[in-house]
Amino acid sequence: MAPKQDPKPKFQEGERVLCFHGPLLYEAKCVKVAIKDKQVKYFIHYSGWNKKSAVRPRRSEKSLKTHEDIVALFPVPEGAPSVHHPLLTSSWDEWVPESRVLKYVDTNLQKQRELQKANQEQYAEGKMRGAAPGKKTSGLQQKNVEVKTKKNKQKTPGNGDGGSTSETPQPPRKKRARVDPTVENEETFMNRVEVKVKIPEELKPWLVDDWDLITRQKQLFYLPAKKNVDSILEDYANYKKSRGNTDNKEYAVNEVVAGIKEYFNVMLGTQLLYKFERPQYAEILADHPDAPMSQVYGAPHLLRLFVRIGAMLAYTPLDEKSLALLLNYLHDFLKYLAKNSATLFSASDYEVAPPEYHRKAV
């Protein structure tokens, strides 16, 4: 019997593609193609991503047990000393399976736009629902750390978190003659582990006030912030060091703080801004093209990150124990924000946008 032939790659080296990274699609380039164990993989470079502007969740089949394992999920900040650990790399490029790669065609570009829009709407709706008393919400009223598999949920399709459960098995799907690779990617996405971080009760009102000040009252957070993200993170790191942590834990805190900063700088422009803020963001980019946004923005935008960061961590295929351990670090930082909320959050940090700005924001 003749040996089974290797599968034929759908994409070629140098080809422009779209690649799933987290819940979104990004423009990318196929740098290399490899076939191993009858599976096609591609070495992907994300267009426009570099050490200053990009971060990706680390992928490993290992279970994280030590502090060094945990911080390996975050990228090494530029200029930091090299850490010899198998989960850390210096490149933002990565090997991905064929199921995450799509052709760069109009239909998939439309899907990219739809996913981006849905992601932004889900973010806004999650913040709005957080203000409603007596109702379950998708993100703000979960347990401290919640890690669960979406495919194991028994909720009726289409229901939100407040929906009823159903014990009735779903009828089997009709078999398709051909499998759409786009649909395959979406199903894979829906089956991934869902990671949610609880926002402390003391901080929830600030999420709502922040939304109200910007979207309803048409005010803008004053930039540059009186106390920027870099300064907040530095204060937190110093606070943890002052409590007599061991060298290993101190190292972990430093790396987690650096990771939060990198995630913030990457996600701000695409996932952490309201529509009304975009002209302001464009002006900041024009005036300070080389400045990291963590040196410009402050506590309210940093808090928004923790509503969204779970979606990125969900694409790190680690077991529940490892994810919970990582999230403990993030939640500890949130407790620090809550403890210092009186000095970090204030409505006086916002200002009414001038008439000419309103014309830009239309």
Curated annotation (Swiss-Prot):
Key word Phosphoprotein present: no
- Extract the GO molecular function terms from the UniProt entry: chromatin binding
Chain spans, region Interaction with KAT8: 26-62
Where is the protein localized? Nucleus
Region described as Sufficient for interaction with SIN3A: 133-266
The record's listing under Pfam families reads:
MRG (PF05712), Tudor-knot (PF11717)
Q: Which GO terms describe its biological process?
A: chromatin organization; double-strand break repair via homologous recombination; fibroblast proliferation; positive regulation of DNA-templated transcription; positive regulation of double-strand break repair via homologous recombination; regulation of apoptotic process; regulation of cell cycle; regulation of double-strand break repair
Q: What is this protein called?
A: Mortality factor 4-like protein 1
- The gene name reads MORF4L1
